[in-house]
């Protein structure tokens, strides 16, 4: 008798089946990668929001220690040609002593002055590392970046600081002043905790600069704020009463015209 053995024939993937699997994996990757990227974007927006809460709280604590309840406001130098007649004077310029004043109220990390959704912190810290051979890790380092690398007498922070501050010297002018500048609203930005506008006018907002719609208050094109996929999605603003608002792109409005007569505006 001849014995026969039944063998199970194992069948592998055909070429067509393999191509179908690869195509399905490609589709899944195409769906998952944008979702993961958007998740990272939202996480960074949350980090920015938390940073603004800490900055607003530090400003409130500073005002609590001030005899007149004044919010952080340090003079800007007037000997710079950039400040003549408010030309090239912007709300992201602050007096350098403000950095140390806010440090004593909890803002001890230099990256707190930079938006986590933009590259300015990475660029500036890389420049500092190349110059001094060490990371930019302290507020003193941040001040050194402005004075020794940028050769500046004031700080260029990665946000707009709206608390009015005096210009140095005998002048009584302050910046920003809603009564002297082309602004959308006539109400002043708060300078003290008892001002009526502490819950309606922000003391800080995301850096955003662009052109305005001629028929309205929204922007047509802009840079800054929180962008994803090549489009601005939202921007944060923080208030002296402690709350932070995240404005969608469709709800943003211009607040300050940078140079009179030009289509260049700051939005939040």
Q: Model-predicted segments: where are they?
A:
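N-terminal single-pass transmembrane signal-anchor helix
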Residues: 9-40
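N-terminal secretory signal peptides that target proteins for export/translocation
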Residues: 1-8
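Short, well-structured segments within or immediately adjacent to enzyme catalytic domains
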Residues: 46-268
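Acidic/polar helix N-cap motif
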Residues: 8-9, 51
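Juxtamembrane interface helices immediately C-terminal to a transmembrane segment
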Residues: 31, 40-51
